[in-house]
Amino acid sequence: MINDIKKDADARMKKSVEALNANFHKIRTGRAHPSLLDAVTVEYYGSEMPLNQVASVNVEDARTLAVVPWEKSMVPKVEKAIMTSDLGLNPAAAGNVIRVPLPPLTEETRRNYIKQARGEAENARVAVRNVRRDANGDLKSLLKEKEITEDEERHAIDEIQKLTDKYVTEIDKLLETKEHDLLQV
């Protein structure tokens, strides 16, 4: 029972950190990275598809992405999808290749991205703490039902706290790395 609660808490906390990492990949730094366009969806035969399922996205150089749709007829739709995404990018089609130059980040944009990253990190910390609260509540209910002793409950709560501290530290490290990437010119 206690181990199940700990395993569940660990898995849920890990998912929170993975979600944060995915969100951080959507925040662009000054460098080109294929995952930058992961959030872009394209209308493909009547349904919205992620860009990486209708085209290949490659890094051409440090500030340019090359997007090659698998069907030539998709070039205008892919170009429009990138342009209308809220990433502030202006793609240019050349034949069946769409080049996406990344404008250099202004100081103000960097600050806004850092603020956004800090907000995402705080949301992840809150999610981890909510998992801790749920796990502690489950332990208290087991204690109330006399399925575990007070010592077992106290020990399990300490272990859940250690898990929480571990994942919050991991979140802080991810945030520090992202801030460092954003501040590099």
Swiss-Prot record:
Sorted alphabetically, the keyword list is:
Cytoplasm, Protein biosynthesis
Q: Which Pfam families has this protein been placed in?
A: RRF (PF01765)
For this UniProt entry, the molecular function terms from Gene Ontology, in alphabetical order, are: ribosomal large subunit binding
Entries under SUPFAM superfamilies matching the protein: Ribosome recycling factor, RRF
Q: Which domain of life is it from?
A: Bacteria
Q: Which HAMAP family does the record associate with it?
A: RRF (MF_00040)
Family annotation (PANTHER family): MITOCHONDRIAL RIBOSOME RECYCLING FACTOR PSEUDO 1 (PTHR20982:SF3), RIBOSOME RECYCLING FACTOR (PTHR20982)
Role, per record: Responsible for the release of ribosomes from messenger RNA at the termination of protein biosynthesis. May increase the efficiency of translation by recycling ribosomes from one round of translation to another.
- What family name appears in the similarity comment? Belongs to the RRF family.
Q: What is this protein called?
A: Ribosome-recycling factor
